[in-house]
Amino acid sequence: MAPPSRAVDALLIALTMVPVAHAQPVSLSPATMPRIGAVDERFQSFNTEMLEVTGGRFWKPYKAYPAGAKPAPMSSDLYEYRPPADLTKPRLRKLAAALGPFYLRVSGTWANSTYFQDTDAAAPATPPKGFNAVLTRRQWKGVVDFARAVKADLMISVAISDGTRDDKGVWTPEQARALFAYTKSIGGRIAAVEFMNEPDVANHGEAPKGYDAAAYGRDIAVFRPFLRQMAPDALFAGPGSVMEGGKVKISIQPELVTEKLLQATGPVYDVFSYHLYAALSQRCGGAMPGLGTTSAAALSEDWLSRPETIHSYYAGLRDRYEPGKPIWLTETAETGCGGDPWSSTYVDTFRYLNQHARLAQKGVQTIAHNTLSASDYALLDEDTLDPRPNYWAALLWRRLMGPVVLSPGAAAGGGLYLYSQCMPEGHGRVTVLAINAGPSARELNTPLPGARYTLTAKELESEGVELNGHLLKAGPDGSLPSIQGMAFGAGSLALPATSSTFLTFAQAGNKACQ
């Protein structure tokens, strides 16, 4: 904890003197909170789009449009060319490493049609027939080197477009074999694989015309033995479907709904995976009324509960078709299609933290946020690499929330959400995450002293975030500020309106955390 000072004392007084709403105080008992599960040590994981690696047209940031202008829904102006990402930047590596260890998922819609050029030559001006992009050895080595530097294990999907298929339209492994072999030859390791990105919307993902569940089943029958031969230790995750089970409905092909995919393959996966976007951003949702959301809804129970609703749908499919298999959420963000303008602001930290905490309670082992550093929903600004509010939320989670999940044992309500996990170091120590999404301060009672880490902002759509009243900023080289808790004593504890607070209890002595 930080050493005492007049400034800290003044801030502590300010936090404890916050006017509290008339809701009944909620009592915590950190010593007796029972264990209800555990998550992977790489629970917080992150996506880098394959298109970032190769270069190409990705979701255009809102700041790139003239002031006051909005992207025309479903137009070519939704995209902006990016050159291949420079993954050697020291600032990027330092900021990413602070979140490790994690899975780095290199995939996305564009990965479905990316050709791996297994020579040291430069990429050709035009991709080979049946592909839309080219991945060079140099580019892929950059990914492998980056993953090693930031303590990440690689997760990928492979190309499945027309260029990978035989004359009967069945997938062939030559391209994937070259990528796996080259990865191994340079000392890399692929830890997990999804066959393709989002097979239930294959009509948007460069699958062959007329692709259906039966075709998917035939492909998996070829891919699974190939994977066992080339990377016997790699986890086979799937199916990796998206946009089912929630309020937002898009044009899923009836012949490709997840249940039909699972029926076609049988129980083949090591890990059941799915993707989750509770709505579409302004880029895509504007053309389809009812598919988007608003910043005004960002703190509502309806919005914050959507991830659990969608998870329940996929968990039900897992239980029927892959019983007992771990479940991973391998791609998610505020909204699909690059995120909304406010996905890069403080208001989205409530969704980020609540989704992680709530799904940890539901048994999700890994959640891969999309993306690390591309477009509006990224943790880092893609031009400056400045950390956005969700980065700081992720950093606090990494430092304070361990893998053992506890029940907080206290009902809250009224916009207050409580979660608890053992601290990363164990030793009986407990962290409680208190998310106050309401417009008024709330009160907790605790029998133990501890330290608080309270995230707030001047405005909900602020691009900055404060920790215990101090603005968080990274140095030019990616160095991080001191992340220190503020001591509090046993008794009453005030939670500011629209704030998220991590409360650590080093003296909890919780047997589940030993």
Region annotations inferred by a language model:
Residues 345:
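Ligand-binding pocket segment of bilobal, Venus flytrap-like solute-binding proteins
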Residues 1-10:
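Bacterial N-terminal signal peptides that target proteins for export
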Residues 279-337:
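Glycoside hydrolase catalytic-domain groove-lining segments
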Residues 9-19:
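Bacterial N-terminal signal peptides
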Residues 15, 22-255, 259-271, 312-315, ...:
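Non-catalytic accessory regions flanking glycosidase/transglycosidase catalytic cores in CAZymes
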Residues 266-278, 282:
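Anion-binding catalytic surfaces of enzymes that hydrolyze or transfer phosphate/sulfate esters
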